[in-house]
A protein has these predicted regions:
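Helix-turn-helix DNA-binding module
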Residues: 94-102, 110-127, 138
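Short amphipathic helical patch at the helix-1/turn junction of helix-turn-helix
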Residues: 7, 107-109, 133
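C-terminal flanking helix
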Residues: 3, 24, 97, 101, ...
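Structural recognition of an alpha-helix C-terminal capping motif at a helix-to-coil junction
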Residues: 18-25, 38-50
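Short alpha-helical "packing" element that flanks the helix-turn-helix/winged-helix DNA-binding module
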Residues: 89, 103-104
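C-terminal edge and immediately downstream basic/flexible tail or linker adjoining helix-turn-helix-like DNA-binding
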Residues: 64-71, 76, 81-82, 91-92, ...
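Arg/Lys-rich amphipathic alpha helix in sigma70-family domain 2
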Residues: 29-36, 46-67, 82
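Amphipathic, Lys/Arg- and hydrophobic-enriched alpha-helical face
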Residues: 1-13, 30, 45, 93, ...
Length: 151
């Protein structure tokens, strides 16, 4: 369960293992805060979401320090294959801020409800809705920049 969640935050298998380890270390250190009023799986899922979110923030900060991201050449049409689409989706998600990326991942990639996504992120439902709206708007702009227009 935790490893599957971490795959949403990185595709690097070795990094997934490190993030899973970080989740369990954080869970162990936070064990006193577990109240038992919700399933342990839910509590661990919340910790995993926060660990993944911090990973994105750190990754983005490190990238900005080292080099500017290279831009993908504009496309004249939609991606031809599933592999192209997956590559483009990964590139577009990398362009979003960690907050935007978290909202998109929880709501659209994992298919969670707004209340559930908000709880996992530690945000209010209103904040989740606003963040998701802004993230979708940014994704549309990035798609148009790549020459792919939303219908």
């Amino acid at each position: 369960m935790i490893a599957r969640r971490m795959l949403r935050f990185t595709r690097d298998r070795q990094r997934v293992e490190e993030l899973v380890h970080d989740c369990f270390v954080e869970a162990y250190l936070s064990l006193r805060s577990y109240r038992g009023d919700s399933p342990l799986e839910h509590w661990l899922s919340k910790i995993a979401t926060r660990v993944g979110y911090r990973h994105w923030k750190t990754q983005r900060r490190d990238r900005q320090r080292m080099v500017q991201l290279q831009s993908v050449p504009p496309r004249s049409s939609a991606p031809a294959t599933a592999s192209d689409a997956s590559e483009l989706a990964g590139y577009l998600l990398d362009q979003l801020s960690p907050r935007d990326r978290l909202a998109i991942t929880l709501l659209h990639l994992e298919g969670r409800s707004v209340p559930e996504a908000a709880e996992l992120a530690g945000w209010s439902q209103t904040m989740m809705k606003v963040q998701a709206h802004r993230a979708r708007k940014k994704l549309r702009a990035l798609l148009e920049k790549q020459g792919i227009h939303h219908e």
